[in-house]
């Protein structure tokens, strides 16, 4: 029996679905999301009532020790997604499409299907915008749920010059707003915004009908997500401005996770000091 099996939610409890997330946006209920990479932590996230779990390619940095997410492969993502899904009974599971796993429509479809069939993901996430909009439309046309990632895109850090806030200038903000609307029209079911000014996060959330999840995107998006190891203060070194250490006032991991969910739901996180 897995170490935390006794903490897992009652399987009879209704699972979170895409329809649940759409209703939460309509009702103004904040969506609490976290990354996860293994079954034991997945059970803890479920016990803490985390709504959405993302098996992120951030595993390349926090699990594998790389400086970027670029080295992560499709095999890595399938392996970790399959591990996470075994620990979940309630949360909605999104799987990340790693670097160069979707350069063409056909390869994107092959890898998305693999992430769902072998990895158990209910939705796939792509770093989007520009030519990727056509890929989002192609996947959506094959009944695959898609999360479109805009703003700071970690897979592109070598091209963009590092990890920095996006959309500060008026033209850049207008371009991101336009891209978000194009992605929604193409069939994206969720938009994830990373490292953008709070006002831009608010504007995009207001403009879209689909849920908008933010990481460093201000308090007015529909939901928040953090890297699990950051908010539990497991990672060492300097952390991004938007990270809050939820272990600081907790006795154990589960208490910290519940504190995060509560802070998101009650609109206590992110605070002004976490925003751009």
Q: Predicted regions span which residues?
A:
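Alpha/beta enzyme core
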Residues: 2-276
């Amino acid at each position: 029996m897995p170490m935390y099996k006794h903490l897992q939610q009652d399987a009879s409890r209704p699972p979170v679905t895409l329809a649940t997330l759409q209703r939460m946006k309509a009702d103004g209920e904040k969506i609490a999301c976290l990354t996860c990479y293994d079954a034991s932590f997945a059970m803890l996230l479920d016990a803490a009532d985390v709504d959405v779990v993302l098996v992120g390619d951030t595993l390349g940095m926090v699990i594998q020790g790389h400086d970027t997410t670029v080295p992560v492969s499709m095999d890595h993502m399938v392996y970790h997604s399959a591990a996470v899904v075994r620990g979940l009974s309630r949360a909605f599971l999104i799987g990340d499409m790693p670097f160069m796993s979707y350069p063409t429509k056909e390869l994107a479809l092959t890898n998305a299907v693999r992430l769902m069939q072998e990895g158990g993901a209910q939705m796939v996430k792509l770093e989007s915008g520009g030519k990727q909009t056509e890929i989002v439309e192609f996947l959506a046309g094959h009944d695959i749920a898609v999360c479109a990632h805009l703003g700071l895109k970690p897979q592109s850090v070598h091209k963009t010059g590092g990890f920095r806030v996006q959309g500060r200038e008026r033209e850049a903000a207008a371009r991101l707003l336009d891209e978000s609307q194009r992605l929604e029209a193409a069939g994206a079911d969720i938009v994830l915004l990373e490292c953008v000014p709070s006002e831009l996060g608010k504007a995009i959330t207001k403009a879209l009908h689909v849920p908008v999840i933010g990481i460093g995107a201000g308090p007015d998006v529909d939901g928040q997500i953090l890297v699990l190891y950051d908010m539990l203060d497991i990672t060492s070194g300097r952390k991004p401005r938007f990270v809050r250490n939820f272990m600081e006032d907790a006795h154990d991991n589960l208490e910290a996770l519940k504190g995060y969910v509560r802070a998101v739901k009650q609109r206590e996180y992110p605070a002004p000091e976490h925003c751009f």
